[in-house]
């Protein structure tokens, strides 16, 4: 029987890929990589940190996914893919929305 499978993420390849995309689309195009669902199981925090410097926004599905990125000081603002009906004024996400750190679809 084989042991549990392992996925190794090559962060240098992520850097190279985002640079290649940037070269193809040019500096005027705004990039918004999707890091929802824990970056599809690859680890949203570390993937988001690598993508953030070259991205205008990082797309997440839910408010909780955005909170995770905010708590870990990921520099790019988040774009919610999930419809959001309301945010409480005292909520961290409400403050981030006012400050441009969160965007709604």
Per-segment meaning from a language model:
Residues 1-3:
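Gly-rich Lys/Arg/Thr-decorated short loops/hinges at beta-loop-alpha junctions or inter-strand turns
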Residues 5-8, 15-16, 27-105:
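Active-site-proximal beta-alpha core segment in soluble small-molecule metabolic enzymes
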Residues 24:
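Conserved PLP-enzyme active-site core in the AAT-like
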């Amino acid at each position: 029987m084989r042991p549990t499978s392992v996925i190794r993420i090559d962060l240098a390849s992520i850097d190279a890929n985002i640079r290649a995309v940037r070269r193809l689309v040019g500096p005027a195009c705004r990039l918004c990589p999707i890091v929802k669902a824990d970056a599809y199981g690859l680890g949203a925090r570390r993937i988001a940190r690598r993508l953030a410097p070259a991205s205008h926004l990082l797309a997440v599905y839910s408010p909780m996914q955005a909170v995770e990125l905010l708590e870990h000081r990921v520099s790019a603002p988040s774009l919610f893919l999930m419809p959001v009906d309301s945010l409480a004024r005292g909520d961290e996400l409400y403050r981030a929305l006012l400050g441009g750190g969160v965007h709604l679809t």
